Amino acid sequence: MSLQNRIILIETSTSLCSVALTENGVISAYRESSAPKAHASLTAVFVQEVLAERGITLADCDCVCVSKGPGSYTGLRVGVSTAKGLCFGSGKPLVAVGTLDTLVAQAQEEIATALTEPRNDVGDGFKFIIPMIDARRMEVYAAVFSPVIPSEVKVIDEVAEANAKESQYCQITETAPVIVDENSFAEYLEQGPCLFIGDGAGKCADVIKHPNASFIQCNPKASAMLQPAQEAYNEKRFEDVAYFEPFYLKEFVATVSKKKLF
């Protein structure tokens, strides 16, 4: 895997806004903020700051990578709009990484850390990783990732298969909305240890009490996009900057405010 490049990484799919710069396969600068409703004001600023920290400009970078979702409608639009603006202005290519792929990369980092620094919430191996994004109430956007490509299981698409070439895990179910109850993901929990990770994991821990279930409540971070972004860039999976749209999973539904103006 070629690592001789620079990639700007933008992650705004949840309440955490983060931007990172990767140089030659290493995160060289990073910014994040969980300030409420600050994505629009901070994302472009963070991009400027990580470039300035390294003494380079956008012209010195090879591409821009953005989280494509699923996630917050507003957050995704801010990230994608910023990334597209950078690409339009510089002529740099755009690559996109699924939010769940980022969470799986974070999970692998947590597992690797647990091998040397034992923790109560993370073991040293999982049959499945189940990343999930909070979709409000008891709903999450989730998919199941397996540590190998089992001969009896078909990888869901070419992108998932490409990601599996470098990652230890591959996606084996479609990304879908799930209403969580005590029986959710039972077929996977019965097969062995499962790690639930993401900003939807916490509420699952309240209802899924299976002994094979472990939970990490966290937000996806731009720094964890390094590996999937590098894979997308190496394989030239570039997006059409003019027409690229986030993967919302569900259509946005506008509601009428109940607050009275007068």
Identify the residue ranges that each predicted region occupies:
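Residues at secondary-structure transition points
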Residues: 34-42, 73, 77, 81, ...
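DPxDG-like acidic metal-binding loop motif
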Residues: 66-99
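Stable alpha-helical structural segments in soluble proteins, enriched in small hydrophobic residues
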Residues: 50-54, 89, 107, 222-233
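Acyltransferase
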Residues: 214-262
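Surface "functional belts" at beta-alpha junctions
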Residues: 26, 93-220, 253-254
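N-terminal beta-alpha supersecondary unit
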Residues: 2-68
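Conserved hydrophobic/aromatic positions in well-ordered beta-strands
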Residues: 20, 141-145, 247
